[in-house]
């Protein structure tokens, strides 16, 4: 299976980034693997140039990754684009998973495996909780929705 799995993420001040990194580290450690994290060192609106450089650096390394977990589908697509510069392609040379299950990731020529956050269910639940509050229900609730892995063809079968 994959042994050198890298997490490539966004800006350093994001709560979402911190939670995704923590989940990645926990999963890696549970499987006896060393977490490898590469995140931007500053906040930026356009992650493209940073992501490109990080990707080129990782794949030029003596021990390049055999799999990448990207912070988002957009990050994953930027990684895929940069890998092409080196003649690399997923899933032939490495596996990649995004996060968000965006419409672009579903396109057949990208076919990005992605983690779905079930945005529709999240939105519906948020409206339901808001209506309950408006109706006088002041209980504090915590709802946890399980993400779903949407398997497409950006990961090698192992």
Question: What is the predicted role of each segment?
Answer:
Residues 1-158:
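Bacterial carbohydrate/catabolite-sensing allosteric modules
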């Amino acid at each position: 299976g994959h042994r050198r799995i890298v997490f490539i993420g966004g800006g350093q001040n994001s709560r979402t980034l911190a939670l995704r990194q923590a989940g990645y580290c926990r999963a890696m450690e549970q499987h006896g693997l060393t977490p490898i994290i590469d995140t931007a060192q500053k906040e930026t609106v356009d992650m493209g140039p940073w992501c490109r450089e990080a990707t080129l650096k990782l794949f030029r390394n003596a021990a390049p990754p055999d799999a990448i977990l990207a912070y988002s589908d957009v990050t994953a697509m930027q990684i895929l684009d940069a890998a092409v510069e080196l003649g690399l392609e997923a899933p032939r040379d490495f596996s990649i998973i995004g996060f968000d299950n965006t419409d672009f990731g579903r396109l057949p020529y990208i076919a990005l495996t992605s983690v779905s956050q079930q945005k529709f269910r999240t939105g519906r639940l948020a409206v339901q909780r808001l209506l309950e509050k408006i109706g006088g229900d002041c209980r504090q609730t915590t709802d946890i929705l399980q993400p779903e892995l949407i398997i497409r063809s950006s990961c090698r079968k192992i």
